[in-house]
């Protein structure tokens, strides 16, 4: 599916729609219209063919940026959007313009003009391949610019003082190493500068409080901004709060939302500064340190400080090198840089005698050979690509001489991979400065610009810079004097800050900061730029908070991504690149300075127009958006923007309207081509507003997305049926109590989200939504069942019923052939209809917190169902289901379960279900011979079998070499496991499991030595009859004895009691020195120096790790050997 782009606008979708218009479905198209459409398509295809190679074939970040800003390219985008509007309106048979001419007459002329200008322009001709300049031998005699880095360091004195704590911590890592044996301990967030407990003083004009009858309101509002609010006082206009873990930014944002004005007066620490306490550890020394942080957070500064720290102590490191990379770095130059700085070119053993460009492998081999026996410090600054780092890493040999490698990066994905792939790596994450430190730094810089400060401008600047040192320094020096001159004119102060936000690249003093931030933006591929620019609607006053689900869905509605799975992947990619940081649940945050870059870029490309707090309304209203080449395509309104300005604005071409905050009175009738209307969390929206929205058919006939989450609506009006093109409807977290039957009229609906509402049942008309892909009814305890019509949703991919009162699902669920995700967590659903086996190949069922979900067993297909007589088909649901939740939790794969207690296998199962891949059956008594024969030889696909016996077994079940040829998992539940395996039995069995209660002791052999493929034996004991019961203990002893003789040593033994694993784990690898290992949660390996501990077997992974570990006691106590095995 063609998608929209920040560079080409709607060009690709328009070409796709024109092809559809000229297809067989529109054979009755008027001749003139068909002729115009063919002409326009041919002209636009020519333009697209010139653009596509440049976009697809390795354009640099700067070239893509120039492409987006190009005047002719801007005309192409605007033309494509107008063309897109015209085609959509034509499909609806409601063209906007009347007259005798064709619907595309005006656009035809514009298309012809733009196409001609494109073809005549030299700029858009196919690019000529350029070769990298060669590196001559003379390069070796003249060190490149990076080699002179140490002698040309920029003055970082402003940051040095603020980073002393981080410097001390990293120096200890360099000199002493740290514990890398524990996976989690190899990622440390920078030590905080202050302890948690603080006293915060906020000043708000008394007239603004507005709560004479309730003086507790400010304390209630403030409580969410503290981990623990201990006390507070309100005296006049001064609010004093004492507590732990204060989030100052959130506190000020909350108070400003409630009362309009709030200024921080003072923050006092009530405890001493936290002392750094890193001690050397006896496990491993850190070989590699990865410093992770946002641009401007001080990564490079820390690296420079470390490099300088050792500049006078040459005996510590024999050789040093500091190399800075860029997104498009030349690796050959980088390796040459390292070679020169460490002095390898002076070594007689590795002379360079070639001419031209040295081969990378030559450089790698020579650097490695030179450093192999030496103590070195290598710093690689600003790593962008993991592949580049791997090449550099190959040239730097590891040794035991105390050498260190330091890399800095802004990409979370690289830091994660560094820790995962290198056991000797340590990730050191530099966090933003806390509010107090940020204020101190800002105040220090501001006082250099303003000698006498009547008011302190730092509070607003600190809010905006959010702890980024470089931003604090640059913005403080740029704005302190201006804000001081404005005295207490709050509106003008906001405008000054807004100028930084909207024009960060235009202010000379902010250029170093802007360039650093733009590096990350220029590094993004085009599709990620498009998606990221959608975030420019968010504002730093609201914390830059991004709701993941809201943003992803809007991407899809806007046409930037076609599939939800792809959109989720792109979101994760942006997180991995450091643009967003996970905050909690579904919330992420973007740093205000990054938002400023996005705002600027968005304005440059005319991508999103943002109007709201701090805007100059006169300027905003008079922008040349009425120009035919610069229409408002996407509009975001934020609190504080006056509605009267709409009278001078043309929003008839606006495709998307996002409203953040309580903005009401928007004249929606002025929006003629709206596709996206996002009103989420706007508490000013009530039932009357929604009804009016639905009645404005003229304005909203193209509407695809309607977001009403968190509004005050209590019902969906009947007029909702007028939104015929609606594809996404979000009404979650509202007060609606029912879905009207008119919901069935929304034939194009793809996503329906009604979670966390008061709805008690779904109407049968839900089955008319033939294009529905996502249905979310979670968090609604009033819902107890789903209608059978749900089986008519043939394209449904996601069904979420978690946290509801649903206990069973309709059998029609098996007809949902495209269902991919079924979430039944925290419901009464324990089994699925057997018909669900039809979708076993694609469906993942979520019954617990596992991300992967459970797969369903195979065996049921459409042909099987057709072969069952109708008279018997209904009875099948009485004897067969799919078990997804066992008393012991969720199995890794569902299993077909014979419902009830039986004396023999039901006839229906034998007649129609011999093709099943699994079976779970509960019997009164022993397994009769004919049933044994059926299971062993008449179920050729059987891979998992569960036999449960109510009565004690007097004689053992004999399993011989015939039958069960495909069985891999076998579970027997009885009082005692009376079963014997003969030679050659169950040749593919890997997992054998017993669940028993109590019975007389027996030393009869079980015969597990005959199970040639066996890997694991599990004993599950009832919580009433534990493993020390004589009968159970005797059976376990028999298995232990046979395990010693099994050719597949080691065989893993796992014992559980009740619903939990017990600390009895034994892996049998020989007949000598067999002991039971007690791996209790408290048992851990402890470092005598630092006291850190490491559990030998991590919780949740014991099942996977046991088979690969030989856990004899001497080895168990050695972390190193356990890790190697």
Swiss-Prot record:
Q: What organism is this sequence from?
A: Oryza sativa subsp. japonica (Rice)
Can you tell me which family this protein belongs to?
Answer: Belongs to the disease resistance NB-LRR family.
Which InterPro entries does the UniProt entry name for this protein? Disease_R_plants (IPR044974), Leu-rich_rpt_typical-subtyp (IPR003591), LRR_dom_sf (IPR032675), LRR_R13L4/SHOC2-like (IPR055414), NB-ARC (IPR002182), P-loop_NTPase (IPR027417), Rx_N (IPR041118)
Pfam families in alphabetical order: LRR_14, NB-ARC, Rx_N
Q: Name one GO biological process term.
A: response to other organism
Tell me which residues make up the NB-ARC domain.
282-564
Each LRR repeat occupies one of these ranges, namely 651-673, 676-700, 701-723, 725-746, 747-769, 771-793, 794-816, 818-841, 873-898, 939-966, 989-1013
State the protein's purpose.
Probable disease resistance protein. Resistance proteins guard the plant against pathogens that contain an appropriate avirulence protein via an indirect interaction with this avirulence protein. That triggers a defense system including the hypersensitive response, which restricts the pathogen growth. At the opposite of cultivar Kusabue, the cultivar Nipponbare doesn't recognize the effector avirulence protein AVR-Pik from M.oryzae.
Chain spans, region Structured coiled coil (CC) domain: 1-273
Alphabetical keyword list: ATP-binding, Coiled coil, Leucine-rich repeat, Nucleotide-binding, Plant defense, Repeat
Q: By what name is this protein known? A: Disease resistance protein PIK5-NP
What GO molecular function terms would the record report?
A: ADP binding; ATP binding
